[in-house]
């Protein structure tokens, strides 16, 4: 079997950033999958499920309610390796096109107060596994270390 595209990226060189993982074509429609990489693979600890889960609920809520991008959001969710998340958007985009959106989203997570949307037994299959404080900490870290002064090498996969 051939390797899938996401495992052909050199994870030794990969740093936190926003990357186009793939583009899929459904007729004349394009779906862009973004790799929202938050930690350096195999260099620093992965994120725990509780903070990733809290982040997933907050990010999905923010994205689906966004005025411009909300109707284009197909999916937001964590990577199995727990080093980042995937965002799927309807449309043909490049990483630079969503830096503003991702910055707004992580500011929303960093500044969030109150009950996490959907964090109840009725709404979620694992609602007790959430850590808002760590989600906020990781959002702030990503903003400061990556998004607020993002460089070109954090927008294009390494060779």
Placement of each model-derived feature along the sequence:
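M16/MPP (pitrilysin/insulinase) zinc-metallopeptidase core fold and M16-derived inactive scaffolds
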Residues: 41, 45-97
């Amino acid at each position: 079997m051939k390797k899938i595209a996401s495992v052909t990226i050199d994870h030794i060189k990969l740093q936190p950033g926003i990357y186009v993982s793939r583009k899929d074509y459904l007729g004349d429609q394009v779906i862009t999958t973004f790799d929202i990489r938050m930690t350096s693979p195999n260099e620093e600890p992965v994120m725990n499920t509780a903070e990733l889960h809290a982040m997933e609920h907050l990010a999905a809520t923010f994205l689906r309610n966004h005025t411009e991008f909300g109707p284009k959001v197909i999916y937001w969710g964590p990577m199995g390796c727990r080093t980042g998340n995937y965002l799927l958007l309807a449309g043909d985009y490049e990483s630079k096109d969503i830096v503003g959106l991702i910055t707004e989203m992580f500011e929303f997570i960093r500044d969030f107060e109150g009950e996490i949307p959907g964090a109840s037994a009725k709404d979620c299959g694992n609602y007790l596994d959430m850590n808002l404080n760590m989600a906020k900490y990781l959002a702030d870290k990503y903003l400061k270390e990556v998004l607020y002064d993002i460089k070109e090498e954090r927008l294009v996969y390494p060779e």
